[in-house]
Amino acid sequence: MLESDEQDMAPAWIAERGGTAIGFVATGPPRDEDVPLPGAEIYAIYVLPQEWRSGAGRALLKTAVNHWRERSAATLVLWVLEANSAGRAFYEALGWEADGRSQQIDFGAFSVPEIRYSLRV
């Protein structure tokens, strides 16, 4: 079951099983200026590891994409750690493509590369 919090322009959804949250997706307007408008961004998506392959992640992402499609978004984007091969395979299986943008994000003394994925809706 998906619970929704569609306040303002940054809606989020929670996936539940048996009354317990097992994942979430948070979305909103794109933060990157080069994303064609109207567009949207998946800010975060997370599913508990024990729920991977349960369909929860797919349902969350599909719900978010449909929400923005209904609001005439043409492109959705998300950022993923370059080394996150499982996450990247998940997005690619759902039609997302690396769009050539990359950036470094800093966590204290560490710098981690991210790549951007896009989906035309």
Model-derived regions: residue spans:
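C-terminal "cap" of GNAT-fold acetyltransferases
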Residues: 12-13, 38-40, 74-77, 81-88, ...
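Active-site acidic-Proline motif in GNAT/NAT acetyltransferases
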Residues: 48-50, 54, 82-83
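Acetyl-CoA-dependent GNAT
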Residues: 1-50, 58-63, 67, 71, ...
